[in-house]
From Swiss-Prot:
Catalytic activity: D-glyceraldehyde 3-phosphate + pyruvate + H(+) = 1-deoxy-D-xylulose 5-phosphate + CO2
Provenance organism: Chlamydia trachomatis serovar L2 (strain ATCC VR-902B / DSM 19102 / 434/Bu)
Lineage summary: Bacteria, Pseudomonadati, Chlamydiota, Chlamydiia, Chlamydiales
Official protein name in the record: 1-deoxy-D-xylulose-5-phosphate synthase
InterPro entries assigned: Dxylulose-5-P_synthase, THDP-binding, Transketo_C/PFOR_II, Transketolase-like_Pyr-bd, Transketolase_C, Transketolase_CS
Binding site residues for thiamine diphosphate: H75, G117, H118, A119, A147, A148, N175, E370
Entry cofactors: Mg(2+); thiamine diphosphate
């Protein structure tokens, strides 16, 4: 495609210089740019395609950054980035090294007001901005999808909107989708609440009937007014009960109508709910037909709108931990006919679709409501029914009190399948699963474990149903290096606190969590080049630790390395040091994990190099710390 307009848009001011008639052409160019770029990099595709005209119209009518846009979640901000000076090579590398973030990021641009990545917070943030703003001429526009209205935080914010708040426009992008199909009563009821077509038609018929009454009935006008009041009481949109003036619904793919509507409401003196109807994936046939699959795509996704190339197909990858977990849950579902599975809007990402299809009555997607997912699971467990709550590590933060108060304090045997435990790499700082141990380890009654491969994952899932206590099984979104057995119950149960020695040596004790065992075994081989032999242990459990085994090993190992893909604060290293202190054991401990910083997005090798968790870095850090020999200077691995 030839780009005649987009290359000349370096800021919203350049957009303002275009005539209204040129905006549809610009929208076509933006849509094609996104498809071309993401076919090489992967990223959030369908939501951005669906929001092209809306974002162009917003930037055309308002003046960012003086007028402030707050994107809920932020993964649908690619168009916003293109219109605010980021149509550069960095966009072509989005979510990769030297590329833009896939979410709004203030470090990139002053047009991005907040870091984003989690759902439901835009309205609260926007209200806070409005409360604290000294600029009375600035407009504040939170931009939310309809799925965000199922978030408790959004409803709490709706309850707090002042009726006299001016220049505050809530933009509702209604595509009737979350990542997958919307669930629950709130998203499904939005159209009925705010666009009551039957009542509108009834109003027209009644008014027509009144106008045809005999002219000597002088109270026709009064009667019409009373009818209006009565019908309005029936059709009053939900959002007007919160003091909002409702405008819409507007065709979200007619950029001219969007501009005209926004210009009309721009300076109204009350808060406004601007309702826009869009099609997720609009402009790409495959994405329109299957917006769930095309919500987030990998590089080289199937795309018939571009010229076919030999690489323009889905690449086959090894089976991942989440895929194994989904398969294991299906097997458990057959073995335990009462087993329930709960997820907060992550059925597809956590590979639960097969369970949902096989056992629809035993599967619940609660929508973007992590706290409810946890407490709902607690209620299921209290009834005596086995339950697994599958949830991303980064989203579990949002339900910390629910885990504490409703699960652990009640001593309920909820199984938490904690997906994406580890670095998220391309999704960046808001999605890394490297903080959950910091609060889970402090929860009484909680058993926490992490498998190094699919076989251990299988053992943990099957065994967890026998523990009768709250438990968390953590696993990353990376290939698992061994296949599961696929037997119904092919092993004796593993008990909480059972560790496993992977290899034995005389000089060092290396304790590695989960998939970092693979790195540890590579490091062990590197250390042999220096004449150093290493005992490598997979603790399997972070809580409780295998105290008996550790005490035995520490009688002849005084040099210990802890290796984990988790924050250095509050993880396995912290638990091990507490264990040493409680047992008055002295040891020289090198704790290696994710440093105390927000980790950016990037390719895996780049991020692991940045934080010093490659096998080469770890080897040199061990040599340097324990002074076994003269190592390669560590500074060479940390270039500025």
């Amino acid at each position: 495609m030839t780009y005649s307009l987009l290359p000349h848009i370096h800021s919203p001011q350049d957009l303002h210089a275009l005539s209204l008639d040129k905006l549809p052409v610009l929208c076509d160019e933006i849509r094609n740019k996104i498809i071309e770029s993401l076919s090489l990099t992967g990223g959030h595709l369908a939501s951005n395609l669906g929001g092209v005209e809306l974002t162009v119209a917003l930037h055309y009518v308002f003046s960012s950054p003086d007028d402030q846009f707050i994107f809920d979640v932020g993964h649908q901000s690619y168009v916003h980035k293109l219109l605010t000076g980021r149509n550069t090579e960095a966009f072509s590398n989005i979510r990769h090294d030297n590329g833009l973030s896939g979410f709004t990021t203030p470090q990139e641009s002053n047009h991005d007001i907040f870091f984003s990545g989690h759902a439901g917070n835009a309205l609260s943030l926007a209200l806070g901005l409005a409360k604290g703003s000294s600029n009375s001429s600035s407009h504040i526009l939170p931009i939310l999808g309809d799925a965000a209205f199922s978030c408790g935080l959004t409803l709490e914010a709706l309850n707090n909107i002042p009726a006299d708040l001016s220049k505050f426009i809530i933009v509702l992008n209604d595509n009737q989708m979350s990542i997958s199909e919307n669930v629950g009563n709130i998203p499904q009821g939005i159209s009925q609440w705010i666009y009551p077509q039957k009542i509108s038609k009834l109003s027209q018929k009644i008014h027509s009937w009144i106008q045809n009454l005999p002219s000597f009935l002088h109270k026709k006008k009064t009667l019409s007014h009373k009818v209006d009041i009565a019908l309005k009481s029936l059709s009053h949109p939900l959002f007007e009960q919160f003091g909002l003036h409702y405008v819409g619904p507007i065709d979200g793919h007619n950029v001219k109508k969007l501009v005209q509507a926004l210009q009309m409401i721009k300076d109204q003196p009350q808060p406004i709910l601007f309702h826009v109807c869009t099609v997720k994936g609009n402009g790409l046939t495959e994405a329109e037909r299957d917006p769930i699959r095309y919500h987030g795509v990998k590089a080289h996704f199937q795309n018939t709108s571009l010229k076919k190339t030999s690489g323009n197909v889905e690449l086959q990858t090894p089976i991942s931990f989440p895929q194994h977990a989904g398969n294991i849950l299906c097997r458990l579902g057959k073995k335990y006919p009462q087993l329930q599975v709960v997820t907060p809007a992550m059925s597809l990402g956590s590979c639960l679709e097969d369970f949902r299809k096989q056992f629809p009555d035993r599967f619940t997607d609660v929508g973007i409501a992590e706290g409810h997912a946890v407490t709902f699971s607690a209620g299921i467990a209290r009834s005596g029914t086995p339950v697994c709550c599958s949830i991303y590590s980064t989203f579990l933060h949002r339900a910390m009190d629910n885990v504490f108060h409703d699960v652990c304090m009640q001593e309920l045997p909820v199984i938490f399948a904690i997906d994406r435990a580890g670095l998220a790499f391309h999704d960046g700082r808001s999605h890394h699963g490297i903080y959950d141990l910091g609060f889970l380890c402090s929860m009484p009654n909680m058993v926490i474990c992490q498998p190094r491969n699919a076989l251990v994952l299988e053992r943990l899932f099957f065994s967890s149903l026998l523990w009768k206590s709250p438990c968390a099984i953590r696993y990353p979104n990376i290939p698992a290096n061994e296949k599961a057995s696929n037997s119904s119950f092919p092993f004796s149960p593993i008990l909480p606190g059972e560790a496993e020695i992977l290899c034995q040596g005389d000089d060092l004790l290396l304790i590695a969590l989960g998939h970092m065992c693979n790195t540890a075994l590579t490091v062990k081989e590197h250390l042999l080049d220096y004449g150093i032999s290493t005992t490598v242990v997979d603790p399997i459990f972070i809580k409780p630790l295998d105290r008996k085994l550790l005490q035995s090993l520490l009688t002849h190992h005084s040099k210990v390395i802890i290796l984990e893909e988790h924050s250095i604060h509050g993880g396995l290293g912290s638990e091990f040091l507490l264990f040493l202190n409680q047992h008055n054991i002295k040891a020289d401990v090198l704790s290696l994990g994710v440093p105390d910083m927000f980790i950016p997005h990037g390719n895996p090798e780049t991020i692991l190099n940045l934080i010093g968790l490659t096998s080469d870095h770890i080897t040199q850090r061990i040599l340097s710390h324990f002074k076994f020999s003269t190592p390669i200077p560590i500074e060479r691995f940390f270039k500025a």
